[in-house]
């Protein structure tokens, strides 16, 4: 079987549980049942499927560098990720709970995060690109995988190779997907993404009725999910939230019988009308606060430490770092630490005489970061410490009370940016 000049090796679809719509009893006529990957019969309920589900895959560690060859280490607590997923799943019940693991699981490692979540009971994953879907498939052989960025021209065969599901956001993609399924007798599933207010990706709402009629006329339509995306879920009082929920409720009625998904991490903490059949948290899994409350309901996941290379005395009136932006107002003791913006530690976290910057933890005490963050190094004012420090001592940049949300504030960015920019010059450790 050929697609262009590339031979297509189509895997036999796996039997997996998938989100089920919660309005089946409301249907006055026969519902549109989402087909199984084989296209034969409606999917079974998750409880029945779980009874005969295969054992979870073994834990898969990611790639790392030797500790002796780098200046910093990054520890990811996979147990905390799994617990965060359980917390979110409980909050969203009876909706099913997926996991978004795009961007290398927000910088935490697709393979270890996916295998930990699969072991915790998660069986549906969302990624941005097909290359990420391949990694998820290797770590969770029985998972349902959706690819948010959809089908690039000529790439439909890639989805068939690993039994991944495209999230279709325009009619061109839908035409290509239908043609591929017809030519190759492929019965794999897909999602339809409708734009309800983000004005980014998604089919126009005006197309929903005609597409729903088309789906009703095709017994093996392959549409396993309809979805949209909230633009302002992190602002609970924003009027667009309720407008999007109302518009999506209308779409869901048109596609009665097909599971529906709207809520992201913050959307889970809106009222339950945003939950529908499947929620898809991302940033909250990795320890960021998905609410506007000061108390974070998520467990911290990431700890970032770097080694102290040198401690030195700086006379009063002397400056530190590029641009001479920070001036010692007294005789000061500073520590030079082996991490910088090349490692993803944001340059705006540095400070100047006019602006306070971020902090790090040394010997259990918070100390200010001073001067500019440079490519490989930063400086910390440790004058207030009462104990001696030594070359090779650890300094904590994330952890010991410093979370990704606080660091994002120092960097004048968002928590997503903090996590996904963390680089690969670390010795990485995955706790599980």
Go through each PLM region and give its residues.
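Active-site anion/phosphate-binding pocket segments in diverse small-molecule metabolic enzymes
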Residues: 2, 49, 54-86, 90, ...
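Positively charged, low-complexity intrinsically disordered regions
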Residues: 6-12, 21-23, 46, 53, ...
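N-terminal acidic, proline/glycine-rich, low-complexity intrinsically disordered segments
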Residues: 1-33
């Amino acid at each position: 079987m050929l697609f262009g000049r590339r031979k297509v090796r189509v895997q036999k679809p796996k039997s997996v549980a998938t989100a089920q719509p919660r309005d089946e009893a409301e249907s006055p006529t026969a519902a549109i049942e989402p087909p199984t990957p084989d296209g034969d019969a409606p999917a079974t309920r998750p409880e029945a499927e779980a009874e005969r589900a295969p054992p979870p895959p073994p834990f898969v560690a990611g790639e790392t560098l030797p500790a002796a060859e780098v200046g910093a280490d990054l520890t990811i607590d996979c147990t905390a990720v799994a617990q965060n997923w359980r917390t979110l799943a409980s909050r969203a019940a009876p909706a099913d709970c997926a996991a978004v693991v795009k961007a290398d699981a927000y910088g935490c490692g697709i393979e270890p995060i996916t295998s930990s979540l699969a072991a915790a009971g998660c069986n549906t994953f969302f990624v941005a690109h097909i290359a990420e879907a391949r990694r998820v498939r290797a770590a969770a052989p029985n998972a349902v995988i959706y690819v948010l960025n959809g089908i690039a021209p000529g790439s439909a065969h890639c989805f068939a190779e690993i039994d991944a599901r495209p999230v279709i956001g325009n009619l061109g993609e839908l035409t290509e997907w239908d043609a591929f399924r017809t030519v190759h007798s492929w019965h794999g599933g897909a999602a339809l993404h409708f734009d309800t207010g983000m004005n980014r990706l998604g089919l126009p709402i005006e197309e929903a009725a005609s597409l729903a009629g088309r789906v009703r006329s095709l017994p093996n339509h392959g549409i396993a999910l309809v979805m949209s995306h909230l633009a302002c879920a992190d602002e609970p009082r924003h009027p667009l939230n309720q407008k999007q929920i109302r518009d999506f409720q209308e779409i869901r009625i048109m596609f009665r019988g097909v599971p529906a998904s709207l809520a992201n991490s913050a959307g889970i903490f809106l009222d339950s009308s945003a939950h529908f059949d499947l929620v898809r948290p991302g940033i909250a899994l990795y320890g960021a606060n998905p609410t506007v409350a000061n108390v974070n309901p998520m467990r911290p996941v990431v700890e970032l430490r770097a080694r102290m290379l040198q401690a030195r005395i700086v006379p009063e009136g002397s400056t530190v770092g590029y641009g001479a932006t920070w001036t010692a107002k007294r005789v000061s003791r500073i520590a030079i630490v082996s991490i910088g913006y090349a490692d993803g530690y944001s340059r705006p976290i540095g400070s100047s005489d006019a602006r306070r910057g971020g902090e790090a933890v040394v010997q259990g005490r918070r100390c200010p970061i001073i001067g500019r963050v440079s490519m490989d190094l930063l400086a910390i004012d440790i004058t207030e410490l009462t104990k001696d420090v030594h070359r090779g001592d650890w300094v904590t940049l994330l952890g010991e009370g410093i979370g990704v949300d606080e660091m994002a504030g120092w960097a004048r960015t968002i928590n997503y940016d903090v996590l996904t920019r963390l680089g690969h010059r670390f010795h990485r450790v995955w706790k599980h």
